[in-house]
């Protein structure tokens, strides 16, 4: 069973230098710059669906006659994909300090399972799920029926929102979903910066019922910027939806759809074989230089999935009785919500023989960095460990690593005498202690590398370079 605890405090990255030098001098560490492909173990890290499914986008302006009798609408077939697609009006930059309002009507005539469309304000650089710099409502298809959500994302991936149903979760609500039968629904989406005590208030109205959503104070301070208004696909793997929008207004002004409005079209009329889809991992060695700036690194797309996957190198058998150290560079390029990955030491047999989800049976024999966190925050860069019997701890919090593609330095240090684990990201570090009881239970490790969380979820896209790590116990 995993528990959560720990502390976070700022720290100067230069202070890890004595530790680095000490480990280097005793010969217990190994260095990899990945300039050539290493002979690491790849276990289910490169999976390919056969045949490759086809992603199809076919949406935009349509010279059709909606039920109101006025010609022109936007919409069509929109499919979930990690590849972004949108049809949107370019607008002057707006922020969370501006009033926003839009309204219209929509109808869904078909939806396959796991489909999704976002409608509202976003930015041309908005990527991923959940979507930063966005203030939208979402149509979420579930195979002939769909749910409606309203949500926002700030510039640093803070999110908030809710659903148009009773309770907190659509999986347990007594509210019935909408049917994809072409029924027309009316909607209004507004944002008032002075609402909710000055934190900002988002209000979504669907068929006359209002759903207010106050922004968290921290989210308002983080801010967001929008320069597009329109429709875009939900950027996660899945299927498609046929949906149509008409009688649109923006800032209380009607949008003329009687003729082609010439809105910006990106990836909205295309077909391609889909390589990036759950749960088909694609990580290992890469000739790219995203993390270290020079060709050669490891990483790629790693999914949360109930089945095991890893890319790692063998090390001499290590335990909680040995001092452990690792450091390197990391670049985080993309992620969905409910996603994560481990980087550190683990036991190959414990990992590859485990076929149950982590919430039924925790992973055993690991000491690692866990890049993961709640969707309201994003991704913490924090320590985690588990003993040979599966008892362990995940830190409550840690430095937040944003999926913005920037390169960062990091380190992980475990002291066997005190049980202290220190994780550092740039100039911020976190510490926690392996309890005496857990140290007595013990853990063994014979691999170092990347390995997945075995629980259903979404993906992370990372790159690791200039890697130093303990490969044998000191003094051997």
Q: Where do the PLM segments sit?
A:
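Short, aromatic/His-centered strand-loop micro-motif at the edge of beta-sheets
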Residues: 155-186, 384-409
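Short tryptophan-centered beta-strand motifs in secreted/extracellular beta-sheet-rich domains
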Residues: 34, 102-104, 176-195, 202-204, ...
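Extracellular carbohydrate-recognition regions
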Residues: 25-54, 244-281, 476
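Extracellular glycan-recognition surfaces and repeat-rich motifs
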Residues: 41-77, 264-302, 306
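Bacterial N-terminal signal peptides
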Residues: 9-22
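Flexible glycan-contacting loops in extracellular carbohydrate-active proteins
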Residues: 214-244, 433-463
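N-terminal secretory signal peptides that target proteins for export/translocation
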Residues: 1-8
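Secretory/extracellular carbohydrate-interaction modules
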Residues: 69-163, 299-387
